[in-house]
Amino acid sequence: PLRLVGSEMCIRDSMMDIAARSLKIKRNVITKLLNEGLYPYTKRYLGTFENHFSTIGLIGMNEVGLNANWLRADMSDPRTQEFTKEVLNHMRERLSDYQEQYGDLYNLEATPAESTTYRLAKHDRKRWPGIKTAGKPGDTPYYTNSSHLPVDYTVDIFDALDIQDELQTLY
C-alpha cells in the first residue's frame, strides 16, 4: 500500500485536528446562542444540535495524485484510487476518535467546495508555481471536488461510475 510517512501524515492529521476543534468551538457557540434564545425558530424545529453532524471533507485528491512524486497520476489510475481509499479510511478512523473525544457526531462528506477549490489552488499556485491544478494551462486554477475524476475524463458515465463506486461509499 502507498502510505503517507512522517511529516505528510503529521500535516494531514494536524489539519484534521484543527478542523475538528474548530467545528467543536462553532458547535459550542451556536448551542449557547440557541439556548439563550437567539435562534427561536431553529430552537422550535430542531431543539438541539445533538443529532447533527460536524462535517469534514477533502478536496483535490485528483491533483494530489498528479503532484505526489510517488504517484504522478490522476484519479483514473488504480494507484491513486488505492491511495485515496487509504486516506479516506484513515480520515474515517480519525472522525471516530473525534466523536469519542468531543462527544459530538462527526462525518466525512464529499463536500461541494467550488469557491474553496479555486481559492486554495490560487494560493498554492502563488506559493508553488509548478503545482498541477485542474483546468487548462492559462485558465483559472482550481482543484477537483473531493475524490472526483478530472472534469473532462470521460463522456461515458458508466466508466466514471465504475471508478468512483468504491470511493464514494467511503463518504
Predicted feature residues:
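Single conserved hydrophobic/aromatic residue that forms the stacking wall/gate
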Residues: 1-6, 10-11
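Acidic, glycine-enriched catalytic cores built around paired aspartates
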Residues: 12-59, 63-171
